[in-house]
């Protein structure tokens, strides 16, 4: 990375140049041009090396989403072999992403509503439905299960003969979690499944009504399942198809089980088990998402009594609700025979019980500062800082092929323009957004675990970075992020032993800080005060005769991001409190990386 001012100065005095850019995209290790004598007295810093988290899976259909739906298979059972389908398979590409909205609202369900006519729309319910766990039914953020019409489609003119449920298997959540518990928590709920449809396929253990031939066998139609309280023994709490998960948030693991609850009557001497385990779950947490395996519990059932004989390596899901109150996910068995969805929650709160729930820690930051109101608004995130969710629409923040070496870059997708910083940051991203003539700023990052921040004890950790700012008072000033000498600079000294942070934000081509920042560390974040100097900030410094000055004092907040608190960032906004026409306003986002001494 070459600075022309530095190059010119090199012609007249000895200097050292800016350090090499990390990854070809720039770094924050900016030092003023110095003489040889200064080099011996002033230390020089460079970005600490870091590695981005590996992408678990970049395939479109296994990427994070609000939810997924799969069409219930129905094969064309036409009497003419020319049109008859012998097999309607399931495949990984059959899962369709669901968009943001209420959990029980999505386009596939709307499609069924439009064509239902006088038919009943049948869908899974937890409160009094076919599957439920008593004490774990008050779901707010998640829905999972099925929605379908009992409506055959016999259209001889178009050579279509379809029998069985017409609908979808799905899960959907809202408000992806930004905080998660920090201890072991039990979640309970339900699960549902559908199989492929294959000519002459029957599963004796599911009953004749479940399907499998002309249509996929569906959990809602499985026979011999305990669904009614009247048929249960005293104190029984689990009905239908139930799920149970133990999530250890400290070591980021999930263990779970998917059950069938058996209907046992006096005349039923064949099945005396209260529960039958169908799958056990093993998964690992990644931010507010998880990925793992579903292990079939009865692989030896090769006689066709049931379809649950193959493991799945494609299990995925996430936590929903502000503090990880609920979870949901899906998988497809490796033999493509079974598609399954599940949803579960923490135990329902009783009246008068502590509503706060278990202790949590922040795992993700994602927000924007609106350009009109100068207010912080939370936005959704699935924990991938290379993607941004704007009003539920996913934007890739990756640079184009021609911009991969750029320190910051611009993108334009789905009517949104974004300027994204910075190429040397692996665990956070921040920048500017423009949509429908509205200009906002944004920041998102994957927080450092609280335990990692607590383990740091150094008294003088240095972080360097840059910032975007907009400041107004009669006239306005705006500043762009930069890694050039003389550009917008952010510098912080962090004392992890006393939990104190002091820093400055300096504007382009200026020597005095635009803002000084003092803050205190709490857990894996910080909060404090950002304020202009005693004389204020000159919005138009070239106008020496009648320059506009603004005085700002605002609450600043932010967090540490990545492994071992390698990065930090934050923001503040000031919506103004002066009479109309003289309002002082500001919005700022900043990011920085920890520095190391150049050896």
UniProtKB/Swiss-Prot annotation:
- Highest taxon of the source? Bacteria
Primary site of residence: membrane
Q: Where is the lipid attached (S-diacylglycerol cysteine)?
A: 21
Expression induction: By iron starvation.
Q: What residue spans carry the region label Disordered?
A: 39-61, 80-119
Q: What does the UniProt keyword field contain?
A: Cell outer membrane, Lipoprotein, Membrane, Palmitate, Receptor, Signal, Virulence
Q: How does it sit in the membrane?
A: Lipid-anchor
Which positions make up the signal peptide?
A: 1-20
Show the ranges annotated as biased composition (Basic and acidic residues): 39-51, 107-119
Q: What does this protein do?
A: Neisseria acquires iron by extracting it from serum transferrin (TF) in its human host. Acts as a TF receptor and is required for TF utilization. Involved in the initial capture of TF. Helps select only those TF molecules that can be used as an iron source and concentrates them on the cell surface, maintaining the iron-loaded status of the TF C-terminal lobe until its delivery to TbpA.
Q: Which family does it belong to?
A: Belongs to the TbpB family. Isotype I subfamily.
Report the protein name in the record.
Answer: Transferrin-binding protein B
What is the primary gene name for this protein? Answer: tbpB
């Amino acid at each position: 990375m070459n600075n022309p001012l530095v190059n010119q100065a090199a012609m007249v005095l000895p200097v050292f140049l800016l350090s090499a850019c990390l990854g070809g995209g720039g770094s924050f290790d900016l030092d003023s041009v110095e003489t040889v004598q200064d080099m011996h007295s002033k230390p020089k810093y460079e970005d600490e090396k870091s590695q981005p988290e590996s992408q678990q899976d970049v395939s479109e259909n296994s990427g994070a989403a609000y939810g997924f739906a799969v069409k219930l298979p129905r094969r064309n059972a036409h009497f003419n072999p020319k049109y008859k389908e012998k097999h309607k398979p399931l495949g990984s590409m059959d899962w369709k992403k669901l968009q943001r909205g209420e959990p029980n609202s999505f386009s596939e369900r709307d499609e069924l509503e439009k064509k239902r006519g006088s038919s009943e729309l049948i869908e899974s319910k937890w409160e009094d439905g076919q599957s439920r766990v008593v004490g774990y039914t008050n779901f707010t953020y998640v829905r999972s299960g099925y929605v379908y019409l009992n409506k055959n489609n016999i259209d001889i003119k178009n050579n279509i003969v379809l029998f069985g449920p017409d609908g979808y298997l799905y899960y959907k959540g809202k408000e992806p979690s930004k905080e998660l518990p920090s201890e072991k928590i039990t979640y309970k709920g339900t699960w549902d499944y559908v199989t492929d449809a294959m000519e002459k396929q029957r599963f004796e253990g599911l009953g004749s009504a479940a399907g499998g031939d002309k249509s996929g066998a569906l959990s809602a139609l499985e026979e011999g399942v305990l669904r009614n309280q009247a048929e249960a023994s005293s104190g029984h709490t689990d009905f239908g198809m139930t799920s149970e998960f133990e999530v250890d948030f400290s070591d980021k693991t999930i263990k779970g089980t998917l059950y069938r609850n058996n209907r046992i009557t006096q005349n039923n001497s064949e099945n005396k088990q209260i529960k039958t385990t169908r799958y056990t779950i093993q998964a690992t947490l990644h931010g507010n998402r998880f990925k793992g395996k579903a292990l079939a519990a009865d692989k030896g059932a090769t006689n066709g009594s049931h379809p649950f004989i193959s493991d799945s390596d494609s299990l995925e899901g996430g936590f929903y609700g502000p503090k990880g109150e609920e979870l949901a996910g899906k998988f497809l068995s490796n033999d493509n025979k079974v598609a399954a969805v599940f949803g579960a929650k923490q135990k329902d709160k009783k009246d008068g019980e502590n509503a706060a729930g278990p202790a949590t820690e922040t795992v993700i930051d994602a927000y924007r500062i609106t350009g009109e109101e100068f207010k912080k608004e939370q936005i959704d995130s699935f924990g991938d800082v290379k993607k941004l969710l704007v009003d539920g629409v996913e934007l890739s923040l990756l640079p184009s092929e021609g911009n991969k070496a750029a320190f910051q870059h611009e993108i334009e997708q789905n009517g949104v323009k974004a300027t994204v910083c910075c190429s040397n940051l692996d665990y956070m991203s921040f920048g500017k957004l423009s949509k429908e003539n509205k200009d906002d700023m944004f920041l998102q990052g994957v927080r450092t675990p609280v335990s990692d921040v607590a383990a740091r004890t150094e008294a003088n950790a240095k972080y360097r970075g840059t910032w975007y700012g907009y400041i107004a008072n009669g006239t306005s000033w705006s500043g762009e992020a930069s890694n050039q000498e003389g550009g917008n600079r952010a510098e912080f000294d962090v004392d992890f032993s006393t939990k104190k942070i002091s820093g400055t934000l300096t504007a382009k081509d200026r020597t005095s800080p635009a803002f000084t920042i003092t803050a205190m560390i709490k857990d894996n974040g910080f909060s404090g005060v950002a304020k202009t100097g005693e004389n204020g900030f000159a919005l138009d410094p070239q106008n020496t005769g009648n320059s506009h000055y603004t005085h700002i004092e605002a609450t600043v907040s932010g967090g540490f991001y990545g492994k071992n608190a390698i990065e930090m960032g934050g923001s503040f906004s000031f919506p103004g409190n002066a009479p109309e026409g003289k309002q002082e306003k500001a919005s700022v986002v900043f990011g920085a990386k920890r520095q190391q001494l150049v050896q």
